[in-house]
């Protein structure tokens, strides 16, 4: 499928650089078939039915952007996938400096050695410490890896803002941004409504922001991300659906993991491992009935995903409406609630 079919023009002033305060005061565009309604995130409980189940991604963003030195020169790396207790795949710039065996100094006594170098600025780093000690060093010296379209340095506010309130599993280098809208009050209102919730973990990688550089989706390579869906969670989601409830994925990351764990029989199974699932129009959904998601970049794999889920022409029209109404886009922006369209137009 041609990538340019997923292109659109977005005014730069609609790219949110800070989140709504409070989180659940953001706007929500409801898209059901051909109809659209302009609402707020706080309206979500009334849009769901008792017995529905919300599926959240509980990954926690780590300070994955590091500034270091190689000799007299500087280098910046963004970790994107843990490959061992002391090893991470990363994107680096300038990448030409990262040759196997080279040592990067991030702080006094905190270093990493280049174990391997890949393509397109990728490399594998082996740190001088592992596990909790490595996480502590990242917390001390790393920066929150804000998306490249937020054109400002990260600051202390981002340590809280770019994290869901229920994050608990260290490992993401990008936030599951639909979840940023939830507050304790909103979760309580959903519980009072009779909507249950389940947690899955997909450690979002920096590859989520990589542009699609090819002209055809068949030629695009997705980066793998590590996820876990426990047997207990699978049982809870299957039970909710069997009782007539809808499965509502909070974010594309939760959706991608759910779809990775579900077969054509629509039974969700335990999952632990990597997924590089790439969802484009024509994909047959097995796990998810509704999707809450923010507004995505043109030509991105995530805009392709929502087009596959809710219909390509419907999403083009919905995005045109959102732009005309001044919705805020991307990670810190507003959100939408989409229903699955059996007719994928």
Swiss-Prot record:
Gene3D superfamilies: QueA-like (3.40.1780.10). It is an enzyme of class 2 (transferase). Keywords: Cytoplasm, Queuosine biosynthesis, S-adenosyl-L-methionine, Transferase. It is found in: Cytoplasm. GO terms for biological process: queuosine biosynthetic process; tRNA wobble guanine modification. GO terms for cellular component: cytoplasm. SUPFAM superfamilies: QueA-like. One of its GO terms (molecular function) is S-adenosylmethionine:tRNA ribosyltransferase-isomerase activity. InterPro entries: QueA (IPR003699), QueA_dom1 (IPR042118), QueA_dom2 (IPR042119), QueA_sf (IPR036100). Its EC number is 2.4.99.17. Transfers and isomerizes the ribose moiety from AdoMet to the 7-aminomethyl group of 7-deazaguanine (preQ1-tRNA) to give epoxyqueuosine (oQ-tRNA). NCBIfam families: PRK00147.1, queA. Belongs to the QueA family. Monomer. This is S-adenosylmethionine:tRNA ribosyltransferase-isomerase. It comes from Rhodospirillum rubrum (strain ATCC 11170 / ATH 1.1.1 / DSM 467 / LMG 4362 / NCIMB 8255 / S1). The gene is queA.
